[in-house]
Amino acid sequence: MRAYYALLSQQEGADSLSQFNHPGNTFGTFGDFAFWDPVIDSRMYMVEAGNGEGQIGAGGYYPSYEYYTMALDKGWHLAPTNNQDNHKGRWGNANDARDVILTDDFSEEGIYDALRAMRMYATEDKNLEIGYTVNGMLLGSSLTEVPEKLDIHVTVNDPDASDSISKVEVIVNSGKTAYTWDDPAVLATGDLSVTLDPDYSYYYIRVTQGDGDLAVTAPVWVGETLKLGISDVTCGTSTPVTGEKMTVTTTLFNSESTDARIKSITYAVGSQVLTSATDAGTVPASGTLDPVSYTHLRAHETEA
């Protein structure tokens, strides 16, 4: 990546469009999105949140939403995409995953301008419609001055009668959910609003449909990006078995110039809190915290 970034930093790279392709355990994570640099950041525009020509939820399709969040936490300003990387034909219609670019100028340059502005969202449903603004600014925007409040407005619609919206969330640093709309009557209006305090560096929208399809938007960034968070969560058992111990290990990173104190860390299964600790240590500046481990006695998915 250093060699590519060195090439990208040259004047000839100023008008280029670059994307982080299929991040994950199989293909790599670009050194966990290391070597952030403001010039390179301004020339990287996208990261795949999904990839593959297989049917959504089946083999050959590789969702990577957690790596979208990781890249944002590392300070990158990126829009999500959901592409096919198709080696088998049926280019563009092998599955229902789509990249949506918001523009009223469908010329080549108009589309490129929208890509550079990151007015995009990634969806597993081919015709899901999402609109998203914060204080009137479109997705992909940056509010350099931190306002007193954030007025978040979301519109969402699927024209297919057989599809429904089950949940819409505001996602912030480290993948935390800052707000959720899940009342069917409210969701049925397709017009959602909430006012939040500006406590985080970025805010994006995640939509969950009744059939499980997901969509995520580009964020709106607020103030200077805080570059710290979770870099890895691993299970010490390759094949967990119910009733046997399972150790979950969390590694935290801090790319800021000052130390960061961990106020609390919580492990949960859904809404059930398994364990929580306060004053869990300090992540040194430009460093990582020795992994924090939790041993679970049953095989379940665990969230940190």
Language-model-detected regions and their locations in the chain:
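Asparagine-centered strand-capping/turn motif at beta-strand->loop junctions
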Residues: L252-E256
